[in-house]
Amino acid sequence: MKIASFNIQKFGKNKVSDPDVLNTVVKIVSRYDIIVILEVVDASGTSVTTLLEALNKSNRKHHYTLKISTRLGRTRYKEQFMFLYRDDMVDLVGSYQFDDELSGEGDVFARDPYILRFRCLNTVLKDLVLIPVHTKPEDSEKELDELYDVFQHIKKKWRTDNVMILGDFNADGSYVSKRDMKKIRIRSDKNFHWLIGDDVDTTASTGNNHTYDRIVVYGDDMLKAIVPNSAKPFNFQEAFRLTEEQALEVSDHYPVEVELKSITNTIDNPDGVEEEEKPRLVVVDEDLMELKRGNLLLEREKLNLEIQILRMKMAKKNPV
């Protein structure tokens, strides 16, 4: 099961009104079972509806459902977190709008995380919590550190630590230094596993090669549920053979993605290494079945013959 986060860069009417851009976005989203889209800025909601309709028109076998936050932000500029997920692959079992002011930490987040909880139907991990992030660049260190408290709050609220934090962390370049990264609790706590390396370019622009977009999971159970080496950016410019100009019309970020192991294709071998399970074949030996049927016929004929002999003997003893 593939999960992704995508900062789509000011998603609104202008994006969906361009058929080429809309088509590319649909192709990107269609790669995933769950995707959270950042920077949804259309207050009317029409662009969201347009995308959902185009997505389901393009995906006949898998129906997508939408779950979107309220408009978030301190100023007139607002954004929404938009989740799109295949409802034959997961069930939405919980949603929660975190409010940092109610948590006692003050107004830390420019956009408070909108957190969803899913029951996964076909993966080794049944319970999954997704915490999306889009930090304000100049406050990214403080916001990322606060995510530790968000995690603890969710762990207590929902009694689970199967948590994935994903989104645009803005934790690179001039925003957060390597020294400052060490101060961030979800970085210094070794129970948190950062799946996207520090030297991975997640931007579509050739003007920089920063690692802004990240995926972080908590605990060994979550880490073991991840398909090895599946966490990476998806270079849609290369995959769809777009020019840089065409790619930047879609977004200045790449989606970052990860895959959870399927319950039907993994087994544990004696060495503790998980491998793909080979299909189990049920073979019917038709020759053997035919032989058994033949034996039954012979037994029946033998029985009929014995009955005929017995009748003949009875007739001799009792002549008419």
Predicted regions and their residues:
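Divalent cation-coordinating acidic motifs and surrounding scaffolds
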Residues: M1-N269
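Amphipathic alpha-helical coiled-coil/zipper oligomerization segments
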Residues: P270-V320
